[in-house]
Amino acid sequence: MLHSLPIRRALISVSDKGGLVPFARFLADHDIEILSTGGSAKALADAGIPVTEVADFTGFPEMLDGRVKTLHPKIHGGILGIRDNPEHQRAMAAHEILPIDLVVVNLYPFEATVAKGAAFEDCVENIDIGGPALIRAAAKNHEAVTVVVDPEDYQPVMDAMTAEGGATTLELRRKLASAAFARCGAYDGAISRWFQGQVGDETPRHIVFAGRLRQTLRYGENPHQKAAFYGHGIARPGVASAEQLQGKELSYNNINDTDAAFDLVCEFAEPAVAIIKHANPCGVAQGASVVEAYKAALACDPVSAFGGIVALNRPIDRDSAVEITKIFTEVVIAPDADAEARAIFAAKKNLRLLLTGVVADTTAPGLTVRSVAGGMLVQDRDAADLLSADLKVVSKRTPTERELADMLIAFKVCKHVKSNAIVYVKDGATVGIGAGQMSRVDSARIASWKADEAAEAAGLAQSPTQGSVVASDAFFPFADGLLAAAKAGATAVIQPGGSMRDDEVIKAADEAGLAMVFTGLRHFRH
């Protein structure tokens, strides 16, 4: 086994030329012959670095508009030949194949081409063929060949060569080979997913997901669990794309909760705020301004909001920053923040401030993935957008315009509450949220109890659920959950419908004087 091998000849063919010139100059200073192609060769020559064109090295020109550059025995034989195998060495000598010890390749920007909405033909032309072949060949023969697919690895290679007298260690080569195969897998996965979308294959025989390491986390949900955060490059504004302006590194739970918060608040067209704990909303509201929305959202459950995540769908101004910093908040995420708001947050050193630049389109298609023992569940993300025209009035009484507006907000929030979910809303703000109960009637009771508790703490004469509307994420299987909401003071109900006992539930609503609408749309969240 070959451990520390000197590098004498390198092949460089890169699309991302960041850091290329300093790295190549380092190689040249170590008397390493550099072979290169096209734009890479030009960049090196322009920098005054000695370089040999691959076409001159092989004696075979680039052809087919550059589709064939490095697919040649003198290239692949030089990479794949086993250095201590006599037969390989005899064959290489017979065909005048020289060993290539370092392969530096990064691939055509296929993912970026797709992300910018390029035409089908442009996307196809950005599918790299020669690059993956070079990478896989070098990674396979990692006992003798060093492969680099990421500019971030230039420095570790230079450090190793400096320490090892122009060589790299087997340990480093294996690590780089692992990264190389991972990059090829991610690249092929991106291509296959794009093609599946182009041909409308909703349940492909094989599916590949890949991500790039964004952050090694201190631990996972709990301190005994290891964790990391990966970005997959899909252009959707949120925690993965946000700029963190201040505060400690995000934890696993911070990331999970912040994602839930921003996903929820982006549902709203009007200025809105969501406060989240353990991926469930403590309070959500829309208002004429974000500061009004924040105050209303906080009023829903100020006790649970302590140490929570605050998401806004508008830039943060001074007044909202003042209100948010009155209690301990882990993370604030918003499209932007003005200078005064940033200065106020800066005084709270532990508060993490994330800015996304824009809000997300919650109706855009996407996938959610969950692992199970021996497999994974893949589904479309819940991107359904409910409009008033979609509602079916099933009660004798028709909801008022105010009730209708609050119903749509309540059902919007319900979509983001763990099932079984019950949400009371009044005047554009949640006033009671019941989450995650095995019994729907218990969720209704808990939401009412939480509202009563908040009202008592605020010194209100009556519970804010009086005169509210109530939403359920799934149908009421019996009338008991609806009656619990009526007892809490709700005047109108929005629910999917579809129970075998819908008639019984409708009758109970009519007897209680409630207006009720069916959506025909369920929002389970587990």
Swiss-Prot record:
Catalytic activity: (6R)-10-formyltetrahydrofolate + 5-amino-1-(5-phospho-beta-D-ribosyl)imidazole-4-carboxamide = 5-formamido-1-(5-phospho-D-ribosyl)imidazole-4-carboxamide + (6S)-5,6,7,8-tetrahydrofolate; IMP + H2O = 5-formamido-1-(5-phospho-D-ribosyl)imidazole-4-carboxamide
Entry keywords, A to Z: Hydrolase, Multifunctional enzyme, Purine biosynthesis, Transferase
Gene3D superfamilies: 3.40.140.20, Methylglyoxal synthase-like domain
UniProt keyword Transferase present: yes
Biological process annotations from GO: 'de novo' IMP biosynthetic process
GO molecular function: IMP cyclohydrolase activity; phosphoribosylaminoimidazolecarboxamide formyltransferase activity
Keyword set includes Signal: no
CDD domains in alphabetical order: IMPCH
Pathway: Purine metabolism; IMP biosynthesis via de novo pathway; 5-formamido-1-(5-phospho-D-ribosyl)imidazole-4-carboxamide from 5-amino-1-(5-phospho-D-ribosyl)imidazole-4-carboxamide (10-formyl THF route): step 1/1; Purine metabolism; IMP biosynthesis via de novo pathway; IMP from 5-formamido-1-(5-phospho-D-ribosyl)imidazole-4-carboxamide: step 1/1
Domain of life: Bacteria
Enzyme Commission number: 2.1.2.3, 3.5.4.10
Residue intervals of the MGS-like domain: 1-149
Pfam assignment, any one: AICARFT_IMPCHas
GO cellular component: cytosol
Family: Belongs to the PurH family.
Swiss-Prot/TrEMBL domain comment: The IMP cyclohydrolase activity resides in the N-terminal region.
PANTHER family hit by this protein: BIFUNCTIONAL PURINE BIOSYNTHESIS PROTEIN ATIC, BIFUNCTIONAL PURINE BIOSYNTHESIS PROTEIN PURH
Name the UniProt record assigns to this protein: Bifunctional purine biosynthesis protein PurH
